[in-house]
């Protein structure tokens, strides 16, 4: 039986595939957030985004550097014909991601309560606990994404991102809707709503919002499960197209322990650099919520007069989360352009790593210039237009 041949994507083709997937994901995100905001309210969005702001930096530390490291090492090994190394890199990467995923998940569980206390927002905990397992599934998913990126095949990453976003949309809206319906039915029957005794509809909604946000967070977790299932099935069905002949003719591979050390050595600086932006968002989240708490404590009447229409039907205890949710809504489109330009960097890694491995300086130069040129073509008009 004839062995399969590989079809590697060029730098720009790979960037195009990832960019299109990013646009689709962003469109799905808009479709998701508009009905979600209408469903769980601005107060619920405040809880959801507060939980998400803790999730992102831990997620970044857990897996930001590892996919890049795997992509880099796989592409170098492929360029130099070390096909046995490629197989070992995948196995080592999966073990590393499994360990890091477990540690990241435990870290988020441990940090959840201190974070809620520092933000003076204990009701955010249900959403935090529900979104926490997403770190584990994201880590497992990223082991496949980094591997296929290193093979210069961006399609699995792109398609899994669309599956993940679609799962987030469907499960997030369904779970949030179910929680709201359940809580409201309890109120109509005169029962407690999530452990709270309520006197009217406004108090019932106040009790429902934290758990409705947790329902939305369940969409994030289940979306990562959907993306992971797709990648597992894809790998079992199609594999990586490295042939038996290539494996037989490949040189003796590096030891797994050496490969693991190289992955970690490469991943740490990348993860730390990625962490800076996420930590800034976390600090912003804690600082803004604390300042809102302080402002509301002494100026509640002024704020209610200032936003009389918007705060109608909002309990005093929920004003802070309403204002924070309003702030979060304004940021929904902020990361669109950085997300698009980031795909260029991701698609460039295997091309640059392979060129570096074979000392092809001309290809390195052309690849870097191509990335910078396309980035400028995208970023400059958008910067001027948004400015």
Enumerate the language-model features and the residues they cover.
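Signature of the first transmembrane helix
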Residues: 10-68, 105, 109, 135, ...
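Helix-loop junctions and terminal segments of transmembrane helices
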Residues: 64-79, 330, 341-358
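Alpha-helical transmembrane segments of multi-pass membrane proteins
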Residues: 110, 118-144
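Short membrane-interface helical motifs at transmembrane helix boundaries
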Residues: 103-125, 383-387
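Interfacial transmembrane-helix starts/ends
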Residues: 12, 49, 82-99, 260, ...
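N-terminal membrane topogenesis motif
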Residues: 1-28, 84, 88, 250-270, ...
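Membrane-interface junctions at transmembrane-helix termini in multi-pass inner-membrane proteins
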Residues: 139-161
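Interfacial/gating helices of multi-pass transporter permease domains
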Residues: 37-57, 209, 258-266, 289-334
């Amino acid at each position: 039986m004839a062995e399969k041949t590989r079809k590697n994507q060029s730098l720009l083709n790979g960037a195009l595939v990832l960019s299109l997937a990013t646009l689709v994901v962003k469109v799905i995100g808009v479709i998701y957030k508009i009905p979600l905001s209408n469903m769980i309210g601005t107060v619920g969005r405040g809880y959801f985004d507060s939980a998400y702001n803790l999730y992102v930096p831990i997620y970044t530390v857990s897996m930001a550097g590892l996919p890049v490291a795997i992509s880099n090492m796989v592409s170098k090994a492929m360029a130099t014909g070390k096909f046995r190394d490629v197989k070992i890199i995948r196995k080592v990467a999966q073990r590393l991601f499994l360990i890091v995923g477990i540690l990241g998940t435990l870290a988020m569980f441990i940090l959840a309560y201190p974070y809620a206390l520092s933000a003076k927002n204990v009701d955010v905990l249900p959403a935090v606990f529900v979104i926490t397992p997403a770190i584990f599934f994201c880590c497992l998913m990223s082991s496949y994404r980094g591997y296929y990126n290193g093979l210069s095949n961006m399609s699995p990453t792109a398609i899994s991102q669309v599956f993940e976003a679609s799962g987030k949309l469907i499960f997030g809206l369904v779970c949030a809707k179910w929680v709201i319906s359940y809580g409201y039915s309890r109120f109509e029957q005169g029962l407690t709503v999530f452990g709270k005794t309520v006197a009217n509809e406004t108090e019932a909604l106040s009790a429902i919002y934290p758990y409705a946000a947790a329902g939305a967070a369940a969409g994030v977790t289940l979306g990562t499960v959907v993306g992971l299932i797709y990648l597992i099935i894809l790998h079992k069905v199609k594999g990586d197209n490295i042939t038996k002949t290539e494996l037989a003719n490949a040189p003796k591979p590096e030891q797994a322990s050496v490969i693991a050390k190289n992955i970690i050595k490469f991943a740490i600086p990348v993860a730390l650099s990625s962490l800076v932006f996420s930590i800034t968002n976390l600090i912003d989240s804690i600082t803004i919520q604390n300042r809102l708490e302080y402002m509301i404590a002494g100026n509640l009447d002024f704020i209610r007069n200032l936003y009389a229409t918007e705060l109608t039907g909002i309990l005093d205890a929920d004003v802070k989360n309403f204002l924070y949710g309003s702030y979060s809504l304004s940021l929904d489109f902020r990361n669109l352009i950085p997300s698009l330009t980031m795909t260029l960097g991701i698609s460039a890694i295997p091309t640059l790593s392979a060129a570096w491995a074979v000392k092809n300086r001309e290809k390195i130069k052309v690849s870097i210039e191509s990335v910078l040129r396309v980035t400028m073509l995208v970023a400059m008009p958008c910067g001027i237009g948004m400015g």
